[in-house]
Amino acid sequence: MISCPACGQSCTTPPTNTITATEAAQAFVLKEEFPRQNHELMRLITELWRGNTCDIQQCQNCQLKFAWPFVAGSGEFYNLAYPYSDYPKQRWEWDQSIAALPGINLHGGPVLEIGSGFGYFLKKISPSHLPADRVVAIEYNDFSRNRLNESGFAALGEDIRSASFDSYHKQFSAVFMFQVLEHMDDIAGVVSRINHLCRPGASVFIAVPNHLRIDFNESHQSLIDMPPNHISRWTHAAFSHLGARVGWQMMDYRIEPMSWPAFIKQDLVYTHMRRAQRPGSLANVVRGRRRTRLRMILEGLAALSAAPLRIPSWLDAARSTGSLGGSSWVHFKTPSIR
C-alpha cells in the first residue's frame, strides 16, 4: 500500500510520472562528461530504488507529491551527484525566520539547525540573538562541519533520530530546517523526533522549494525535480496535515515573492541543463566538454541563444495566479503541554 508521507492517506491513483534510473543519473551527472561516475550513479540509484524505476505519486487528500519508493539519497549518492559543495550566503527564508525571533523565548534552551552548510544562517542569529555555545548544528559534510566548529557552534554529523541526541530530550527552543525536508524519508519519524527534542511551545521553521515553481518548471521544459535528491514536494495543505499529526500549530506560511531577473536567469540556466541531458543536443555537446573557461563561455552563449524560445513560458509565468518565487516557508509551534 502506498501511503502519503504527510497526511498518511492511502494513494490509489496512478502515478503522475515515472522516472528511470538512467534518466535520473543523467540528470545529476552527464555520461558524456563523466561516464564512469554516471554508470556508478545509475547502479547506486537502482540499488536505492530496488529496481530501475521510481514513480511520482500525488496524494489526493493534501496534494503532496512524493517519490515511490520513498527513499532518500545516501551519502554515497550525494558524493557522486554533488561532489562540489556550494552554499548560498543569503536566502529569503532566513529573513522570515529572523523576523519571527523577537516573539520567541530563545532563553529557554539551545537551538538546532539541521543542514547548516557553512553556517551562514547561524552567523546571522549568533551572537545577535544567542551565544554560539547555545547553538547545535547538524551537518554531514566533514569540511563544512569543521568550519562550523571553528565558529564556535557544536556541529554534529549525526541524524537527529540517532541515540547521540537522546540527551537533548525537551531541550531545544527552536529548530531550523532550510531546504532539507524535501531530501528526507521517514517524515513521521523526523517530526516525531523533533517533538521529542523540543521544549513545549518551541518553534520549528521549515523552508522547502516552492511547489508552484517546480510544477511550472516541469511543465515548461525546465529541470525535473529529480529523486532520489528531492523526494517530496510540499503544499500548504500537506504542511497543515503534517502538523496536525504531531500537534503542531501553524503560525505562518508564506511563499517567496518572485523576482523577475532571478526567475529569467534561473530559467535560462535550468532549461539549458535540461537540454544538455539529451545526447547529441548542442547543450549536451557543450556541457560534455572538459570544464574550462571556454566551456563556461560556450554554455552561457548556448543558454542565451535559447532566450527567444523561452518568451512564451515567461508570458505564462506572468499570467500565473500563484507566486513563482523559489521557496515556501512555514513556522510551527510544538504543543505547549505534553
Q: What does each of the following model-derived ranges do?
A:
Residues M1-F178, A188-V191, R254-E256, G280, ...:
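Conserved N-terminal segment of class I S-adenosyl-L-methionine
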Residues I2, D252, P257, T271-H331:
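Rossmann-like AdoMet/SAM-dependent catalytic core
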Residues A21-E32, I206-R233, A237-G243, M258:
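Short, glycine-/aromatic-enriched active-site segment of Class I SAM-dependent methyltransferases
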Residues N38, N79-D86, S219-P227, Q266-M273:
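Short glycine/proline- and charge-enriched loop/turn segments
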Residues V135, V204-I206:
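Hydrophobic/aromatic residues located in beta-strands of well-ordered beta-sheets
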Residues Q179-H183:
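A short His-aromatic
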Residues D185-G189, F216:
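Short N-terminal helix/helix-N-cap motif within the alpha/beta-hydrolase-1
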